[in-house]
Amino acid sequence: MKECEYQQIRPGAAPPPPPSAPQSGSGPPPTPRRPSSGPDSAALASSAASVRPCRKWEVFPGRNRFYCGGRLMLAGHGSVFALTVVLIVTTTTLFFIFDCPFLARHLTLAIPIIGSMLFFFVMSCLLQTSFTDPGILPRATPNEAAALEKQIDSTGNSTYRPPPRTKEVMINGQMVKLKYCFTCKMFRPPRTSHCSVCDNCVERFDHHCPWVGNCVGKRNYRFFYAFILSLSFLTSFIFACVITHLTLRSQGGTFLDTLKETPASVLELVICFFSIWSILGLSGFHTYLVASNLTTNEDIKGSWSNKKNMEASTNPYSHKSVAANCCAVLCGPLPPRGTSIRWPHIFPRKERILQGTWTIPSRVFTACQSSSTY
C-alpha cells in the first residue's frame, strides 16, 4: 500500500488556501503552459523531486532518539542501557569461556546449550523492550488543542474560578478521573501518564526503566516481563553452574587455591550474587502485577487500594481471574505505533468506552493496520 505522508504546519500559521474554482462567465479557463525544455526547467524538476514531506518521527517533539529510518527508538539517555548490555554480555562470555568447557567435559553437554538458549532469549527480549514504541500517544494538533481549550473555558462558571482540568468516566462501575496534560494538550486516557524523562504521554504507563533505556508501557510491557523473567533464570543458572565448577575443581586441593586459579569465575560469582536478589524480587513483583492487572504506577500511588483513598476501591481493569488477567496483559492486541501515524489519518471522533476498556480518540489509533508504516 502506498505510504501516507504529511506536511508539517507550524502552530499559529494560517493554513494554505484551497485552489479556487474558475467563476462562471469570467471567460475561458487559462490554457496550461507547456513546460520549456531549457536548463531552468530541468533544475526545477530535479529540486521538486528531491523535496519530500517530513515524516512524523523526524519532527517528534519528545526526547527520544530514532534509528533505522524511525523503525527503532530509544530514550534520550543510553548510558545505563549500554551498561546493562555490557554486564549481561561480559558475564555470559566469561561463563562460556572459563566454566562451560570444564562442565561440559565432567558433567553434560547440555549446560552450554541451555546457557546459550537463555542468553539469546534474554538479549532478544531486552532489545525488543528498548527499541519498541512503549505506546506513545501523539500530541494534539494546534486546531485540536484550540478546540479543546475553548470547550474547557466554556465550562467555567465565574470569572475568578479556573475551568476544570479533569474529567470523570465510568469503567465497569468504577469512577475514573482523567487528567489534562498541559504538554500534550489533551485529556489523558485511563492508565495513561506523562513520562518526565521522555516527555511523552504513554498508554498504560508502568514506569520508566533506565536499565532498558525506555519507558515501559502497553506496547512493550510483555517484552519487559519476559526479559526480567528470563534474566532471573539466566542469572540463577550461571550462579549455580559457577558454584558447581568451583566445587568440583577444588576436590583435588583447597578452595582458596581454586579461587586464585579461576579469577574469572570469581568475578561471575560476585556479579551474579549481587544482581540475583534484585532480579528475582523484580520478577516476583511484576508477576503479582500481571496476575492482578495492575501497573507499577498504580501500585505505588495506591489507585485501587486504601493506600491513598479512605475507602478501598476495586480495580476496574481486573478480569477477576488470574489466567484472564495474564492473557489480557501478555497476549492482548497491540495498538499501532504512535510515532508512525501520519497526519492524514488524524481526525476527531467521539470518545467512548467499549467493553470496559477505554477507546482513545481516533486521531491516535485510527491509522489502518496495513498503512502503519514508518
Task: Annotate each PLM feature.
Residues 2-208, 212-374:
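Membrane-associated feature with strongest affinity for ZDHHC
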